[in-house]
């Protein structure tokens, strides 16, 4: 990460896409996408997804590391080009507990991530706990971040410290997505970004963390990009001009969250304006969902009814029977909720792919289609972009390849935005 940031600060048009997903096909897609380049691949886990208690994935930080390394080994991706990051590391998961207890768990969270070899650490203590006022005083936020940083510094060995980097600040919705519709989004004021940096500098120095300050590479801000279930707010460079100018006077860059579904030109403009770390998550699993839905339509055309996977029906049954991951986010009427379940841009279906019934039905779908020839016309009908790539000779028509390539459509847009020389 340090090299990428240094090159950006030296004037090179260079950024990095942060892949925020625990789905094996998404991770495989990201690693295959850059397999034959010299690029680093940044894969991040969030604190509610992966923590010392297992998170909603059931993985502790060391488990997630081994999970990613296992996929890397399968596809032949070198570990030295992998960067593992931890996002929203702080009291996020324990906001309903008193601050002292939540921070105690947050310290253990940080230690677990750093000990597992995660080198990009987002220190996020911005959320109020059960006995805190709302919002928290910025100095309290910074001092709590310093406590977390101290835990990281004490855990890292000398070799790890060479690669260890920190991200500070937050200007993002609740991790996991917006719970309501959005009409507009507030662009961070440069004075607030400056205050974030100043308070963290004071707090770190109070705690004897002067050296750690040199590892702070980025500040999380809101440049004016967001999405909810049905809408996308696109980047407007002129609205973020002052913010973009301010960071040039520092040794840091910005990190932008919720950049999913922006245009490839917007990604290029964001990197130009020093939002050099672009986080993406739901757009990747949305593309995965589109691919599986498309393959299910092909299955309906090619496989006899009694042999079909019924994957779309199984998804509906599971999500309606177990609505915990979507109920409070989606619209209340049944017809609207079904549209959201299937097609929402926030893609809360992503929480259900590991479910045993859904996983088995997806496996059967792929097995069924592996046993037949996929007609080009059928691929053109349901996956027209992949049909073009087949025609160009850069893709072979297996179900697995079609899914991977569909996910990589998203990554192609980020590469256009982040790469110095693009066609």
UniProtKB/Swiss-Prot annotation:
Q: Does the keyword Transport apply?
A: no
Q: Which residues form the signal peptide?
A: none
**Alphabetical GO biological process terms:** D-tagatose 6-phosphate catabolic process; galactitol metabolic process; phosphoenolpyruvate-dependent sugar phosphotransferase system
- Check the record and name the InterPro entries matching this protein: Aldolase_TIM, GatZ/KbaZ-like, GatZ_KbaZ_carbometab, TagBP_ald_GatZ
GO annotations of cellular component type: plasma membrane
Taxonomic superkingdom: Bacteria
Tell me the pathway.
Carbohydrate metabolism; D-tagatose 6-phosphate degradation; D-glyceraldehyde 3-phosphate and glycerone phosphate from D-tagatose 6-phosphate: step 2/2
Pfam families linked? GatZ_KbaZ-like
UniProt xrefs under Gene3D superfamilies:
Aldolase class I, putative tagatose 6-phosphate kinase domain like
Name the keywords, alphabetized.
Answer: Galactitol metabolism
Question: Family, per the entry?
Answer: Belongs to the GatZ/KbaZ family. GatZ subfamily.
Concerning PANTHER family, the annotation shows: D-TAGATOSE-1,6-BISPHOSPHATE ALDOLASE SUBUNIT GATZ, N-ACETYLGALACTOSAMINE PERMEASE II COMPONENT-RELATED
The UniProt function text for this chain reads:
Component of the tagatose-1,6-bisphosphate aldolase GatYZ that is required for full activity and stability of the Y subunit. Could have a chaperone-like function for the proper and stable folding of GatY. When expressed alone, GatZ does not show any aldolase activity. Is involved in the catabolism of galactitol.
The record's subunit annotation is: Forms a complex with GatY.
Give the protein's recorded name. D-tagatose-1,6-bisphosphate aldolase subunit GatZ
